[in-house]
Amino acid sequence: MITIKKLGFSYDTNVVLKDISMELQEGKIYGLLGENGVGKTTLLTLLAGLKDTDAGTLEIDGQIPYDRKPSFLANIYYLPDEVPAPRRKAIDFARDHGQYWTNFSIQKFSEIMNVFDNDENQRMDHMSYGQLKKTFISFALACNTKYLFMDEPTNGLDIPSKAQFRKAVSKYTSDESTLLISTHQARDLEAIIDPIIILDRRDVLLNASLDEIANKLFFDYSSEADPTALYQEMVPGGNIQVLRNTTGAESKVNIEALFNAVLLHKSEIKEMFNK
């Protein structure tokens, strides 16, 4: 389990995260949302042990990430948004680097590369950005780590590749693994992320499962605007609206509309989910 209590981090005098607290349960695929600059990437690098906290505590299964103990590092993988382009064939890179992760599977790497229609025998420095990104996603999933942190993994992927990404994550992630995926393209991941975390620079605005969200909020697709809506947006054929769910009615969570509603009503929605 990941436990974060009153976490703080600054770059010199620039406060990036302050007083952040939350828990992440095992065996979930979390979506991490937030406006640009609120510290999503910083949080991922702190979890991966690449930076040390300035305040508060951060523990993963009782270990402090920045201690970077071999037993801890063997159980995590961090995939940044920007990836390098080694002058090597993808299969050779995977075989050589996979030895650092106890549960790495070269067979799984090859299978996921095939899902992405990627050539494992192509040199990585000859790949397009999208092909390179898919190679590192394949490697990350093939490491079979207990914790996998991904920063904007669908950046640079075309529409078919985004569908392949969802398929790969769904098929090749074990029930015991915990994924935390940062994204500003919520629609790309709507079918696979649950729970949803919405981060603010000084607060966790939301950390809830889709069932919890649907229990508290109602997502309405209607031709008529409701003046009590927390958020409204015109779409072809009418409006998507986010309302308080006062009747227990069922609805499908629209993550983009949820995100916008939370930003407009930070305190109200946080209080709603903390009851």
Predicted regions and their residues:
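ABC-family P-loop ATPase nucleotide-binding domains
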Residues: 71, 78-135
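Conserved ABC transporter NBD signature motif
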Residues: 56-67, 71-72
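The feature captures the beta-strand-to-loop junction immediately N-terminal to the Walker
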Residues: 33-35
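Helix-to-loop junction immediately C-terminal to a conserved catalytic motif
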Residues: 48
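Catalytic Walker B motif of ABC-type/P-loop ATPase nucleotide-binding domains
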Residues: 148-152
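Conserved structural motif at the start of ABC-family nucleotide-binding domains
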Residues: 2, 17-19
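ABC transporter nucleotide-binding domain
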Residues: 164-180, 184-243
